Swiss-Prot record:
<dbReference type="Pfam" id="PF02468">
    <property type="entry name" value="PsbN"/>
</dbReference>
<keyword id="KW-0812">Transmembrane</keyword>
<keyword id="KW-0150">Chloroplast</keyword>
<keyword id="KW-1133">Transmembrane helix</keyword>
<comment type="similarity">
    <text>Belongs to the PsbN family.</text>
</comment>
<dbReference type="GO" id="GO:0015979">
    <property type="term" value="P:photosynthesis"/>
</dbReference>
<feature type="transmembrane region" description="Helical">
    <location>
        <begin position="5"/>
        <end position="27"/>
    </location>
</feature>
<keyword id="KW-0934">Plastid</keyword>
<comment type="function">
    <text>May play a role in photosystem I and II biogenesis.</text>
</comment>
<dbReference type="GO" id="GO:0009535">
    <property type="term" value="C:chloroplast thylakoid membrane"/>
</dbReference>
<dbReference type="InterPro" id="IPR003398">
    <property type="entry name" value="PSII_PsbN"/>
</dbReference>
<protein>
    <recommendedName>
        <fullName>Protein PsbN</fullName>
    </recommendedName>
</protein>
<keyword id="KW-0472">Membrane</keyword>
<keyword id="KW-0793">Thylakoid</keyword>
Length: 43
């Protein structure tokens, strides 16, 4: 394989993994533990 391919594949995998983890944190099970600053400061 070429060097560019050997570098691009792991970087792409890391990017996809990070994006998936961010989406899971934002919308999955852990999102219930996140606080909402707008609800804390209702007028």
């Amino acid at each position: 394989m070429e060097t560019a391919t050997l570098v691009a594949i792991p970087i792409s995998c890391l990017l996809v993994s990070f994006t998936g983890y961010a989406l899971y944190t934002a919308f999955g099970q852990p999102s219930r533990e996140l606080r909402d600053p707008f609800e804390e400061h209702e007028d």
